[in-house]
C-alpha cells in the first residue's frame, strides 16, 4: 500500500493482529505511535487526514502498577551497603537517592548536567529534564543533599554543562565524559540489589515507585505526590502507591492452617 491508500480499516487490522502477541498497554502504545506518525504526515501536508485517529485500541484498566517496589528497610539497606570510598559508589548512591527522594524518572535523572544541582534559598535543588523537554525543579531531602555534594566534590565535577552521572573509564576508577545510559543504570541497580540479597526484580523505575509509596505511607498527600512526580494526573500517581500490598500481606497471614 502507498501512504495515501492507507485507511482506518488497515490500521485497525494491524492493531487486531497484535492481539495474542502483545499486552493491551503495548498495543495501545503501538497505536499511539502510529497516530503520532500520521499526525506528523498531515501537518507536513503529505496526507490529507490521519487514518489512525478513529481506530480504538483494546480496553485496559489498572488500579495498581506493575513496577516492583522495595520496602523502606530494603531501600535503606541497599543504599547503606554501597561502598562510598570509591567514585563509582558515590555516583551510584547519588543516582539511587535522587530517584528515591525526588521520584525522578530514570531518563530525567540521567539527562541531568552538573549545573542542574544548585543552591536556592540556602537549600540544594535539582532540575530534572523531563519528557517533551519539560524542566521540573525539586528541593533536595537532606540525605540527597549529602549524597549529591559528596559525589560532585569527590568526582571534581566543575564543568556545569557536562553530564552529572557518567560512565567509568574501564577499570581505572575514573569517570569518563559520557553520560550513563538506562541500560548502565539498570545493570548497576541489579548488581547492587544482588550484593545485599534483594530478590525482588527491581529496575530503574522501582525507586520512583518506592519513594512515592513511602511518602504516602507517612502521611503525604496524593495531590502533592502528583506534583513531585510531575504527573499530569493523580490517577497515574496512584498506580505507584503500594501501601495496600502490606495490608494484603497482613490479611493473608491470618489464614492459619
Regions found by a protein language model. Give the residues of each.
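Conserved catalytic core of the tyrosine transesterase superfamily
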Residues: 1-257
